[in-house]
C-alpha cells in the first residue's frame, strides 16, 4: 500500500516510542534514535518493519525516537502511525492486530 500522508504516533516520554511515517522510494528505511540502540536496535527495527509489512507497506521512511518502549508498545505505535498514514483510522485491519 502507498502512504498517503505523513503521520505520527507516540510520545518521547519514558517507556514510549515516537514513530513518524512518511513516503519513501526504496524500501523501508528506519532512522532509529535510542539510548539502547546498541543492545536492542535490531529488534526495534524488526518489530517496526514486520508491522509495516503486515500493512503491505513496502516503501516508507520511518523516524523512530525510542525511550525504552517494549515490543508491544512499538507495534501499537507503528500500527497507529500506519493507519493514519494510509487514511484508515476508521477502518480497523484486524489481521494486522
From Swiss-Prot:
Nucleotide-binding in keyword set: no
InterPro entries attached to this UniProt entry: CitD, Mal_deCO2ase/Cit_lyase_ACP
List of residues that carry O-(phosphoribosyl dephospho-coenzyme A)serine: 14
Entries under Pfam families matching the protein: ACP
Subcellular compartments: Cytoplasm
Keywords: Cytoplasm, Phosphoprotein
Gene Ontology cellular-component terms listed: cytoplasm
Domain of life from the UniProt record: Bacteria
Job description of the protein: Covalent carrier of the coenzyme of citrate lyase.
Subunit annotation: Oligomer with a subunit composition of (alpha,beta,gamma)6.
Protein name as it appears in the record: Citrate lyase acyl carrier protein
Gene name of this polypeptide: citD
Amino acid at each position: 500500500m502507498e502512504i498517503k500522508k505523513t503521520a505520527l504516533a507516540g510520545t518521547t516520554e519514558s517507556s514510549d516510542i515516537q514513530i513518524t511515517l512518511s513516503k519513501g522510494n526504496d524500501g523501508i528505511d528506519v532512522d532509529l534514535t535510542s539510548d539502547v540502540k546498541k543492545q536492542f536496535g535490531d529488534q526495534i527495527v524488526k518489530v517496526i518493519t514486520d508491522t509495516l509489512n503486515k500493512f503491505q507497506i513496502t516503501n516508507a521512511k520511518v523516524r523512530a525516537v525510542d525511550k525504552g518502549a517494549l515490543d508491544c508498545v512499538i507495534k501499537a505505535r507503528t500500527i497507529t502511525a500506519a493507519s493514519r498514514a494510509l487514511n484508515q483510522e476508521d477502518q480497523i485491519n484486524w489481521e494486522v492486530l
